[in-house]
UniProtKB/Swiss-Prot annotation:
GO terms for molecular function: 4 iron, 4 sulfur cluster binding; lipoate synthase activity; metal ion binding. The gene is Las. Keywords: 4Fe-4S, Iron, Iron-sulfur, Metal-binding, Mitochondrion, S-adenosyl-L-methionine, Transferase. Its main location: mitochondrion. Pathway: Protein modification; protein lipoylation via endogenous pathway; protein N(6)-(lipoyl)lysine from octanoyl-[acyl-carrier-protein]: step 2/2. It catalyses: [[Fe-S] cluster scaffold protein carrying a second [4Fe-4S](2+) cluster] + N(6)-octanoyl-L-lysyl-[protein] + 2 oxidized [2Fe-2S]-[ferredoxin] + 2 S-adenosyl-L-methionine + 4 H(+) = [[Fe-S] cluster scaffold protein] + N(6)-[(R)-dihydrolipoyl]-L-lysyl-[protein] + 4 Fe(3+) + 2 hydrogen sulfide + 2 5'-deoxyadenosine + 2 L-methionine + 2 reduced [2Fe-2S]-[ferredoxin]. This is Lipoyl synthase, mitochondrial. Its cofactor is [4Fe-4S] cluster.
Length: 372
């Protein structure tokens, strides 16, 4: 339960010693900083917010590299508190089956909408396979890291399939942590999960957001040919920033190679990637990244605002405006992406795109099933 303290905090200063006086001054300083900083309400969506209020927002949107102060959250990034029957139902089932989701581990701002159903009334959860601990330490990600995570749960593929079947979904997203400690990077485990899901429902569309498997093309082939419909692998940021944003084992060109080879192994796949904005990239660099993705055949692209998950992670350099995100959506369409989802709260697994991708896949299935 959240409790609001209406009366100001009273500080009693006893003139006992110099240290007591110093402590009082320190406390006053903290109170002043709290008064000027964001409150809990700053992170909750205001239903009365309108586009005009966004246009009139005069807060600072870009931080210089020498500045230590974090930027204040602009109104278009405020979201609602997750709640509702659907949200509680999915959360309880995940706990019961000991499954992890990237929705929780990565602190996704859309968790309330996706799990609760949102305006479309469709529940969507992105299940994170192979545990909640990653062998890599990307500087933007809040997922736990370790050199040797716990061993894989051999029951996870079946448990995941059971959960998906009970939800009655048309589209499911599977993602995973990186498991560089495993010889195959966990590719066979992911592939088995897809097969278990498809065995229970052949009509469900499965998207896998997978690691780069250290560039091992046999692992990429295993995933590409396991029966999934959408092969997703995120490029995350522009080439120049990659060494500073992603783990040192992740490489820009390696990501492009993985996406290219996945398409070569299975031309019927839809390939998908994602770019975070607000890390200090230039427009020219974003444009080049989009061109690079199109060159290797990527068909679906998402662009969203990077948001610092904790104080230990990279600070936001810039809050990109909704208008700028709209520009990138239009540019993506011009470059030939089948689908471009671009917005401040858009994430690689955001369900908004799944409705469109489902339509593409359904049409392809009809064409393939039609008598020749």
């Amino acid at each position: 339960m959240l409790r609001t303290i209406k009366s100001p905090i009273k500080v009693i200063v006893r003139p006992a010693s110099a240290s007591a006086s110093a402590n009082a001054e320190k406390l006053d300083e903290i109170r002043e900083r709290l008064a000027k900083g964001p409150s809990f309400q700053d992170f909750i969506q205001n239903p009365n917010n309108t586009k005009n209020e966004w246009d009139n927002y005069d807060g600072k949107l870009r931080r210089e590299k020498v500045e230590e102060q974090r930027l204040r959250l602009p109104p278009w990034l405020k979201t609602t508190i997750p709640m509702g029957k659907n949200y509680a139902k999915i959360k309880d089932q995940l706990r019961e089956l000991k499954l992890s989701t990237v929705c929780e581990e990565a602190r996704c701002p859309n968790i309330g909408e996706c799990w609760g159903g949102g305006e479309h009334g469709t529940q969507t959860a992105t299940i994170m396979l192979m545990g909640d601990t990653c062998t890599r330490g990307c500087r933007f990600c809040s997922v736990k890291t370790a050199r040797a995570p716990p061993p894989l749960d051999e029951n996870e593929p079946v448990n995941t399939a059971k959960a998906v079947a009970s939800w009655g979904l048309d589209y499911i997203v599977l993602t995973s942590v990186d498991r560089d400690d495993l010889s195959d990077g966990g590719s066979k485990h992911i592939a088995q999960t897809v097969k278990e899901i498809k065995a229970r429902n052949q009509n469900i569309f499965v998207e896998c957001l997978v690691p780069d498997f250290r560039g091992d093309l046999e692992c990429v082939k295993t995933i590409a040919n396991c029966g999934l419909d959408v092969y997703a692998h995120n490029i995350e940021t522009v080439e120049k920033l990659t060494p500073f944003v992603r783990d040192r084992r992740a490489h820009y060109r390696q990501t492009l190679k993985v996406l290219s080879e996945a398409k070569r192994f299975n031309p019927n796949l839809i390939t998908k990637s994602s770019i975070m904005l607000g890390l200090g990239e230039t427009d020219a660099e974003v444009e080049q990244t989009m061109l690079d993705l199109r060159e290797v055949g990527v068909e679906c692209l998402t662009l969203g605002q990077y948001m610092q998950p904790t104080k230990k992670h990279l600070k936001v350099i810039e809050y990109v405006t909704p208008e700028k995100f709209k520009h990138w959506e239009e540019r993506g369409n011009q470059l030939g992406f089948l689908y471009t989802a671009s917005g401040p709260l858009v994430r690689s697994s955001y369900k908004a795109g799944e409705f469109f991708i489902t339509s593409i896949l359904a049409n392809r299935k009809k064409q393939n099933d039609a008598p020749k």
